[in-house]
């Protein structure tokens, strides 16, 4: 019986179709998680190879067990996808046939209370995807200025009550440091009007998302990750990116559109003089989303969006 890895790979069949896997190809899973996508990729390889990255060492350990029957075809690396250039150089790989990245926090990270990602379970304020990293949610909450907290909550969480929440956090930490997830969730709740507390989603959801993004620099690493992916794909190679909130999807959409743009000469020019050529072709003009069957089995897939591009 297969171990329960607590993670259902989102948009699995859509990703496999998008990658158009060749049995002898080289593929990269840049956000390994619990290896749900990686397992199905490597099952389709004969002489091919899978390079799987994750900044969470716990994910690497779990994947090492889950992919045990295929480890002769798999290389597991503790690293960020944005460091892909260095990883491939170290491995002596000069081009790959497909890449996958599923952004955001994984289900096991959410479900493991001690990681500090969940507003429903009490734990120290941590939220680090890479537990060897220095910055924690505790430091963000207790040391960042009011203005910086307000900006993070508003920009990364799209939280309309960001000013009130940031102010309440600053008031509480003047009395004593904020140490735990439930303590922070209660502070957030206390800053919100009664009308907001009647909404379907948890009042701390957007704020926790924002702080997590800040701790892990999730938005900052997206553009270099996409540049590294484009640079290392072979012509005809595919890049598939899954995002879980609108901020990331907008960044991915904009970056892929930039990479797909050709001539930028003014329209009145009779011939192109800029010499710019598209680096990728957009396979999906609109993102692919989960169907009703998947949503019934995995409600966390509701916000997932898949975008696909092909190297020119």
Regions found by a protein language model. Give the residues of each.
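S-adenosyl-L-methionine-dependent methyltransferase catalytic core, i.e., the SAM/SAH-binding region
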Residues: 1-312
């Amino acid at each position: 019986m297969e171990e329960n890895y607590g993670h259902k790979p989102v948009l699995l069949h859509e990703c496999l179709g998008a990658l158009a896997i060749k049995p002898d190809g080289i593929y990269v899973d840049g956000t390994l998680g619990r290896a749900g996508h990686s397992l199905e990729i490597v099952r389709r390889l004969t002489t091919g190879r899978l390079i799987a990255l994750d900044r969470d060492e716990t994910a690497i350990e779990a994947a090492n067990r889950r992919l045990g029957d295929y480890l002769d075809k798999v290389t597991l690396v503790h690293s960020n996808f944005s460091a892909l250039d260095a990883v491939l150089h170290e491995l002596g790989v000069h081009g790959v046939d497909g890449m996958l990245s599923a952004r955001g926090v994984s289900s096991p990270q959410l479900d493991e209370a001690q990681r500090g990602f969940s507003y429903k379970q009490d734990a120290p304020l941590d939220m680090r995807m890479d537990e060897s990293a220095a910055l924690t949610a505790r430091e963000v909450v207790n040391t960042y200025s009011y203005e910086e907290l307000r900006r993070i909550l508003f920009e990364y969480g799209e939280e309309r009550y960001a000013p009130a929440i940031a102010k309440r956090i600053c008031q509480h930490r003047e009395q004593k440091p904020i140490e735990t997830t439930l303590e922070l969730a209660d502070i957030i709740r206390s800053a919100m009007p009664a009308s907001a507390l009647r909404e379907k989603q948890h009042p701390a959801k957007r704020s926790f998302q924002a702080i997590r993004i800040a701790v892990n620099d999730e938005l900052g690493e997206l553009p270099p990750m996409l540049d590294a992916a484009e640079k290392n794909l072979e012509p005809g190679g595919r890049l598939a990116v899954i995002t879980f909130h609108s901020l990331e999807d907008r960044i991915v959409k904009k970056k892929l559109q930039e990479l797909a743009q050709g001539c930028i000469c003014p329209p009145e020019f009779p011939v192109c003089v800029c010499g710019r050529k598209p680096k990728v072709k957009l396979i999906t003009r609109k993102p692919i989303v989960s169907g009703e069957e998947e949503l019934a089995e995995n409600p966390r897939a509701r916000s997932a969006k898949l975008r696909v591009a092909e190297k020119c």
